[in-house]
């Protein structure tokens, strides 16, 4: 896999503010890539298909399960999205396996 990858992700059911207020224990996180964002295996696996081929310092992809997936420029934006989920962060091993599994499904 090209580039430096730091990972975390959320396999979550639909999220509500009320759940977050009660200390939701589900897992949440992000995928951060330092490379050109584009139509890559990693972004396809996450359900993204960027038309734009723009090189930048980093691309942060947040997954929140039932909610739409989002691409941000900074980890701070992802942290804000994941605020309220108190479950343990996914390990890099779990995330790499998730990406591999989804890449097989999306071809």
From Swiss-Prot:
Expressed in salivary glands. InterPro entries: Kunitz_BPTI_sf. Its main location: cytoplasm. It is found in: Cytoplasmic vesicle, Secretory vesicle; Secreted. Keywords: Cytoplasmic vesicle, Disulfide bond, Hemostasis impairing toxin, Platelet aggregation inhibiting toxin, Protease inhibitor, Secreted, Serine protease inhibitor, Signal, Toxin. Disulfide bonds join 28-82, 36-62, 55-78. GO terms for cellular component: extracellular region; transport vesicle. Residues 29-82 form the BPTI/Kunitz inhibitor domain. Tick salivary platelet aggregation inhibitor that plays an important part in the anti-hemostatic strategy of ticks. Inhibits platelet aggregation induced by ADP (IC(50)~150 nM), collagen, and platelet activating factor (PAF). Acts by binding to platelet membrane glycoprotein IIb-IIIa (ITGA2B/ITGB3) in a metal ion dependent manner. Does not inhibit aggregation induced by ristocecin, an agonist that aggregates platelets independently from the glycoprotein IIb-IIIa (ITGA2B/ITGB3). This is Monogrin 2.
């Amino acid at each position: 896999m090209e580039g430096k990858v730091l990972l975390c992700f959320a396999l979550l059911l639909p999220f509500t503010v009320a759940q977050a207020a009660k200390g939701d224990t589900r897992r949440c996180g992000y995928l951060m890539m330092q490379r050109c964002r584009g139509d890559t295996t990693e972004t396809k696996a996450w359900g993204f298909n960027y038309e734009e081929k723009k090189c930048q310092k980093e691309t942060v992809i947040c997954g929140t399960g039932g909610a739409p997936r989002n691409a941000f420029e900074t980890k701070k934006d992802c942290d804000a999205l994941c605020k309220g989920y108190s479950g343990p962060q996914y390990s890099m091993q779990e995330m790499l396996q998730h990406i591999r599994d989804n890449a097989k499904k999306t071809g």
